[in-house]
Amino acid sequence: MSAREVNFDGLPGLTHHYAGLSFGNEASARHQHQVSNPKLAALQGLKKMKTLADLGYAQGVIPPHERPNIEALRQLGFSGSDAQVLAQAAKQAPKLLSAVSSASAMWVANAATVSPSVDSRDGRVHLTVANLNNKYHRSIEAPTTAALLRAIFRDDEHFSVHDALPQVALFGDEGAANHNRFSNGYGEPGVQLFVYGCAQAGGIRPLHYPARQTREASEAVARLNQLDAARTLYAQQDPVVIDAGVFHNDVIAVSNQQTLFCHQRAFLNQPQLMARLAQKVPGFNLIEVPDERVSVADAVATYLFNSQLLSKDNGKMLLILPEEARRHAGVWRWLTEMVAGDGTIDELKVLDLRESMCNGGGPACLRLRVVLNAQQQAAVNPAVMMNETLYATLCGWVERHYRDRLSQADLADPQLLSEGREALDELTKLLDLGHVYRFQQ
């Protein structure tokens, strides 16, 4: 059966701010304590979604989470009214307040790992929510992520949304950001590649930054998603590039259908892995960027590989890049030479995602790829699918509710909490989500 890839982008939330919460993410650390613009972040995200929809790609939206997360603060011993909880946290533990106020759920490449029905034993689309165990501010996302995904993929005949793995380091799981799928056509059986940073059994690990994904987690996700072991591969990301700021594999590699676009140093034992992929994937097409042309540091600084690789009607592919890639002379020179070479990628499109990029999230971070056939796409909650009307509606919603300036000091303002709840309550009606947030229950 024919199928297509549908991109679901995370919408930046009302508390988008720069707190430097993500050790190992160099952009996050570099912009710590700068003043953010949540309204601009959301509008940039919506413009990205609208751009893809206008190009003919199926595009959906995943709503933000409620932040600050008052229940998380109560679990950590703060008490009283919501305003009192915020005041106590701001005075006693401002870093915790920042963590429970993070808008990091916008990077939905970390929301779940998705496997299409053609690869799953029961013929359903499987989505396993990521536990994001390595960072506290992200580990609290899983329950709301599961609720949102079940409100979008709500037909159990077609979809199976699995809860996150146990919240322990052994099963550290970062979702689709460490997962690639290869196939001749979207509707044909594929080969799934899970990328991990470390394994309990041993082997080398990064020395400076944490390896967020474990092999044990990847294997568990493959089991939950009911994958064929013969069509499932596991590969370790090179620990040296993790220490260089490649905290997820999607910062150093991106795939689409039979094509893998990656850096020469993305994987441990890379030549052997490429040979295995060539054996497993008919027509495997490797676009490997040499280290001598683009260093790992420049790849991280520009998010060259944290891009979206999209199939076109002419059989070629379009690469969606952040503005930072165009501003780097060496990276842009390599890209323009590649396109001029009449290879697989014949078009580049640059988007301004500055607000997200300053926190270390590029085009690929903001989207969750879901391969759907026609029946499955018809079963998706239609209210979340991007079109002219929804774009105008959501832009108006952002203009009404979002602040255009936010510092860490603002997180203690009870009015910000009220503004967020009012906005999300309205959004659940606009997107026909039901009562997915705790404050609504």
Swiss-Prot record:
GO molecular function ontology, one term from the record: N-succinylarginine dihydrolase activity
Listed pathway(s): Amino-acid degradation; L-arginine degradation via AST pathway; L-glutamate and succinate from L-arginine: step 2/5
Enzyme Commission code(s) on record: 3.5.3.23
Keyword Hydrolase: yes
GO biological process: one example: arginine catabolic process to glutamate
Ligand binding (substrate): 19-28, 110, 137-138, 212, 250, 359
Catalytic activity: N(2)-succinyl-L-arginine + 2 H2O + 2 H(+) = N(2)-succinyl-L-ornithine + 2 NH4(+) + CO2
SUPFAM superfamilies named among the record's database cross-references: Pentein
Active site residues according to the UniProt entry: 174, 248, 365
Role description: Catalyzes the hydrolysis of N(2)-succinylarginine into N(2)-succinylornithine, ammonia and CO(2).
Summary of subunit composition and partner proteins: Homodimer.
Protein name from the UniProt record: N-succinylarginine dihydrolase
Protein encoded by which gene: astB
